[in-house]
């Protein structure tokens, strides 16, 4: 997720209720000791059985790539010849901007930023993350609806956090939604750690390292280029929604029933409460209409 400061250069271009022991295979099924003896570490990390075109992950990758191509065509065909910046194009394509949400009630900007990217490198890193993580999560959930909800809800929660804590910039990108998928991963591995063999634990540590590096990237490169609040919000949203998906199976058996209910209702409260609090806070603040200055033509 990037902020408006990146655009000074115009040329810058769930698990559902059916998740019982039979469905709870995902990584463990692909890498159990019986099946993993003849496979290399790479083959266990990228099993061929989960990578195919009939998945939402593949569709999401195609949609994100297609929208970025449309952005480039629109920029070089209309925006640049008429003196409009790349940031103006991103704003018109639905990037998140607080005054548009607070003063003009454009709440679609809580969803559309997930589909918009700043640069090819920005898009490539997110597509690579979906290829590395999304297919696994989708395979484990075995439910298109839960997977799509996990992806979208995480992205929305991330955008709410961005508005709440980084309200002077615009932002966009699927990073928050992807960190939500990582949140599912974290909970899954915690609940299944004692069932994993050595290779499985090595892979899980690799995934955790990627998640950690994704989070600290916002700090290391500075808040002017990466919206760390959206990353953290997406991760928290993914964890909360994953708690809800896991509630009727693993959480119920791993924890005291009262603790499981507390986590379950706390997760619901977080997913419902954060958007409400965010909307109240940004509407109580006097926020200038910065959106009026984003698309001023240099030829004017």
Spans of features found by a protein language model:
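Specific transmembrane alpha-helix
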Residues: 157-161, 169-192, 232-246
